[in-house]
């Protein structure tokens, strides 16, 4: 009798574990590597140089005492010509304890993919990291962006494009609203859902927190103009830059 109950108990535990695995995977809570860019214009630093020492200091600092509460930090170290500027931004649902693992991964990933580059950017699902020898605070980066899209198409492309664009525009307005605050700080992030026919679209937009609200709206407005190029009729898509990004999918991909 006890063996029967033991088997039932084990099967129940397995079922719960499978359910949890399915729940996590259905939310697509991954931290996959997406893309990187190594700057050719800023040159490379030499081993043991002042620039390398400044960079190492900043990177070790942000991974240990970074501002993970709001998932953002912009910091600098050194003096010209060895100034180092570093920025990280975690996704809007990946602050606090969820932010540091992504930043640590990004630091090691950037060192590996862009060794000794003075300027470089790397994107993961849940964060981005940028190093530079040039200051960029409150400046929109119009050059470094890219897009990813689902190869599958919607049957009613025209309706889907119209309604998804409307959702993203609504979220862009919300994210860049000067009254959208967390305490006294601009949120610069918004997420939402919309039913289109039989499908439910989940979407988000976000700006880096060095931007003021007007610059955030300007940045989002710019990348939303790339929707036809990126996402025409696609079941999922995103445009990512270093200053702002958007994403939509036919499945939930954000934490509550």
Swiss-Prot record:
InterPro entries to which the protein is assigned, alphabetical: CRR_secretory_protein, GNK2, GNK2_sf
Location of the Gnk2-homologous domain: 33-136, 142-253
Subcellular location: Secreted
Domain of life of the native organism: Eukaryota
Record has Glycoprotein as a keyword: no
One annotated Gene Ontology cellular component of this protein: extracellular region
UniProtKB keywords: Repeat, Secreted, Signal
Signal peptide annotation: 1-26
Paired cysteines (S-S): none
Signal among keywords: yes
Entry's family note: Belongs to the cysteine-rich repeat secretory protein family.
Name of protein: Cysteine-rich repeat secretory protein 29
Lineage: Eukaryota, Viridiplantae, Streptophyta, Embryophyta, Tracheophyta
């Amino acid at each position: 009798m006890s063996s029967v109950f033991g088997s039932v108990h084990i099967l129940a535990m397995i079922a719960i574990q499978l359910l949890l695995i399915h729940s996590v995977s259905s939310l697509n809570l991954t931290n996959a590597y997406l893309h990187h860019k190594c700057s050719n214009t800023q040159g490379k630093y030499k081993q043991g140089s002042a620039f390398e020492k400044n960079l190492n200091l900043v990177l070790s600092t942000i991974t240990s005492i970074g501002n993970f509460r709001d998932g953002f930090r912009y910091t600098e170290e050194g003096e010209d010509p060895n100034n180092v500027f570093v920025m990280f931004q975690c996704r809007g649902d990946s602050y606090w304890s969820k932010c540091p693992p992504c930043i640590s991964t990004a630091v090691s990933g950037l060192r590996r993919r862009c060794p000794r580059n003075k300027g470089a950017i790397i994107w993961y699902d849940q964060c981005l990291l940028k190093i530079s020898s040039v200051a960029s605070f409150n400046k929109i980066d119009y050059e470094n962006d890219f897009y990813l899209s689902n190869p599958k198409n919607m049957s009613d492309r025209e309706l889907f494009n119209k309604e998804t664009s409307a959702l993203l525009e609504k979220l862009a307005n919300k994210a860049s609203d000067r009254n959208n605050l967390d305490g006294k700080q601009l949120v610069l992030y918004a997420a939402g859902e919309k039913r289109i026919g039989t499908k439910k679209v989940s979407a988000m937009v976000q700006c880096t927190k060095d931007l003021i609200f007007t610059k955030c709206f300007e940045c989002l407005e710019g990348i939303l103009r790339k929707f036809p190029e990126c996402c025409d009729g696609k079941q999922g898509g995103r445009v990512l830059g270093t200053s702002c990004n958007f994403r939509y999918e036919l499945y939930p991909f954000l934490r509550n």
